[in-house]
């Protein structure tokens, strides 16, 4: 018995001090932060330089000239307008559709669970691949959607190749890909709501519309804000779907921030201007994040009070 006890209490060959262990465990997070901060600060430095890949020997600081030039450039304001318009339309429509689908699938059942899993299939598709698939389906010559459009009288519907319909087409693809993301978040929120308020409302004979707008919606608001924030930040930085389908065209119809930065970098080889665009985009997303997070914290406390 003594020998066994001694053997069991024998210290292992490798032990980490309790003082060192927290630093070891935080090392992966530190590496991630370094991987984020180095490119960010490099972009900040480049944004204050006149730097072209075609003329690397002429690289020099021009301080704020890249930023100042945007205020007098109509193309920049067009990019800002298109980016905000695209983000606003896609997020609003995806939120409405996602909420509607989540309400329909709220009841726990084998069929509803199966349908929710099937609806996640577009989300598992790479956005660029989804865009190429839709580009084939909307091809005027052999696309299945073009054929269906012709059956209802829309002959030669140009989808993404016309300035008047390009935004509609790309928004349609974005909705198909990302609505399941909002749906699954709101479905999880609906199924996690406490049942007591709804049971009390049912006993009192409260109308369903009143229950939805006065009980369900306020309690679900933190989840709605979370889904909106994630999608808004992602949508305002959209690149894959837009570039794969239209390359930012026709003309400058869909030159959102990421596409404009890409064109500045790879076509114009203007690294400084491209970096400045990305820093402005970061500032916009940071501003929007702060607004949403503050409102999310406030509404979460209100939802807890309702529960």
Residue ranges and their predicted role:
Residues 18-307:
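A structural signal for multi-pass alpha-helical bundles of membrane permease subunits
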Residues 1-17:
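Short, Lys/Arg-rich, polar N-terminal cytosolic tail immediately upstream
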